[in-house]
């Protein structure tokens, strides 16, 4: 009835809303690009940033217009995705304040970073379990839109925890536009997740550290010349990190071994990245240690006899 009174169609209203939603994503896309580039190049102008990053789907003039609209044309940076904006988008509260994380699937944290390949930038999204530091989901994309970044990463994470009741899980992020887009919020609502956002980057430190670990410890040391090679190397790097890399906060265990010992003892386990591992249970490890100790004592006695 209202549509007839206003002489507009329901389809036109939905199309207009889709345009607004896409613009909000693009605004946050531009804001993230400018913020990340200026972290390394504090005085770089928006035109130079555009030619450096060449964001897919956004031309130079629109990029500069968005920067002007966001107040990013000057060197002083302001991230519009950190606060309520004029379209009515409201940030979620930070649910991690004063929270003690004591088990897997209690809190997942996510962040998006970029990686340069032959002068072109691609985007990598990670989702980690805050307790075990396991990368439970990730994606590599050519664009920064929700359907290319956080949604495939979250779908991977949910698939990885298949059969586990995830209702009530806290999904924590930095408040970027992808994390409050309509599509993403519909997915988290369906999963009965609780959305959480931080105001400052250090309040999402675990997710941000994963960015540095994968990029600096792995990807920077690979010979990557294409998007396809980047995808392959991210797969490989995540497998190595999850299954083999010792973590000081996990008693020098890898995330997979840590989860195995404290959560899934007695069962096989496959971590994201495709590498299957079979770990000994506590009893077999004790028996193995006894054999090692016994052999060491025997060798020592033989050495003494030789002397």
Label the predicted regions.
Residues 132-135:
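Hydrophobic "anchor" residues
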Residues 55-58, 100-102, 117, 175, ...:
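Conserved, non-catalytic sequence blocks in retroelement Pol enzymes and Pol-derived host proteins
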Residues 76-81, 140, 171-175, 189-206, ...:
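RNase H-like polynucleotidyl transferase catalytic core
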Residues 164-179, 204, 251-255:
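Acidic/histidine-rich, metal-coordinating catalytic segments
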Residues 8-104, 254-263:
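Basic, flexible linker segments flanking DNA-binding modules
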Residues 129-130, 140-145:
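A short acidic/small-residue loop/turn micro-motif
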Residues 59-126, 151-156, 160-161, 166-169, ...:
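Mobile-element integrase/transposase regions
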Residues 185, 189-193, 213-307:
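C-terminal domain-tail junction helix/linker
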């Amino acid at each position: 009835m209202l549509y007839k009174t206003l002489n507009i169609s329901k389809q036109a209203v939905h199309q207009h809303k889709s345009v607004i939603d896409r613009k909000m994503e693009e605004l946050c896309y531009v804001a993230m690009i400018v913020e990340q580039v200026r972290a390394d190049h504090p005085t770089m102008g928006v035109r130079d940033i555009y030619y450096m990053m060449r964001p897919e789907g956004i031309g130079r003039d629109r990029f500069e217009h968005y920067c002007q609209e966001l107040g990013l044309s000057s060197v002083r940076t302001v991230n519009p995705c950190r606060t309520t904006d004029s379209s009515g988008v409201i940030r979620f509260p930070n649910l991690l304040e004063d929270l003690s994380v004591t088990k897997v699937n209690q809190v997942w944290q996510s962040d998006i970073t970029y990686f340069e390949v032959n002068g072109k930038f691609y985007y990598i999204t990670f989702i980690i379990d805050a307790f075990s530091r396991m990368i439970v989901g990730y994606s590599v994309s050519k664009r920064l839109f929700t359907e290319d970044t956080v949604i495939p990463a979250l779908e991977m994470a949910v698939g990885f925890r298949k059969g586990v009741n995830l209702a009530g899980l806290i999904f924590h992020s930095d408040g970027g536009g992808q994390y409050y887009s309509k599509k993403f919020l519909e997915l988290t609502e369906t999963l009965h997740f609780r959305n959480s956002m931080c105001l400052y980057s250090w309040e999402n430190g675990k997710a941000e550290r994963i960015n540095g670990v994968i990029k600096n410890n792995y990807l920077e040391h690979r010979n990557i010349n294409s998007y396809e090679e980047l995808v392959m190397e991210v797969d490989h790097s995540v497998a190595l990190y999850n299954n083999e890399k010792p973590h000081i906060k996990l008693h020098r265990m890898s995330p997979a071994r840590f989860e195995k010992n404290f959560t899934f003892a007695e069962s096989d386990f496959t971590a994201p990245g495709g590498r299957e591992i079979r770990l000994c249970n506590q009893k077999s490890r004790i028996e193995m240690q006894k054999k090692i100790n016994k052999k060491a004592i025997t060798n020592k006695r033989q050495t003494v006899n030789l002397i």
